Amino acid sequence: MGELILIRHGETEWSRSGRHTSHTDLPLTALGERQARALVPLIADRKIGLTLVSPALRARRTAQLAGLASPRITPDLREWDYGGYEGVTTVEIHRTRPSWNLWTDGVAPGSEDHPGETPAQVGERADRVLTEIRTAAESLGDADIAVVAHSHFLRVLTARYLGLTTSGGTLFQLGTGTVSRLGTEHGKPVITAWNLALPESLLHAAAPHPAQSPE
């Protein structure tokens, strides 16, 4: 296969304010839409043979604005289920749990529908996605595979790709509306690019023309 192209969705109101967002299905902000459109030149020269996308609206809209055609909706790409910490910021959690760390402690129990996930459970999902990617790559030759998803999940996916434990995801910071790439060197998994984005000063160029109404 070629490389694995990781794309984090554009900004939402909750990502801007630092709230943990998993199942809450928020749209992109105006800035988030500009970030998504600005991905186009960052992936224009890539030969992408398959796009896998989280079912969340923010991920699907990012893929659409980035020009990624015929994405495959992949439920395992959903964000870490934050359980009782959905919509809560890290600062707020630290008021009652000063030493709390998502990567080692997991989350507080949530509702029956969204009980929360342990780090191990998220790692298992990432492993399933990597298995799906490797299977698909067998018929794609040297084409890249794009994955449009969420910060914490993509960080776990990266850790597992590199042979690290789930907690290794803490080593990788990932901004909204960014592109990262995973590949190989001498047969070993490596990061070939990380957290790429257009400078904020150029994002206005990615705004839609006033005569156009966004879908």
Residue ranges and their predicted role:
Residues A38-N101:
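Phosphate-coordination/substrate-recognition cap region in phosphate-metabolizing enzymes
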Residues A44-K47, I133-A143:
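Glycine-rich phosphate-binding loop signature in dinucleotide/nucleotide-binding domains
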Residues W100-A137:
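Internal catalytic-core helix/loop-beta-alpha segment
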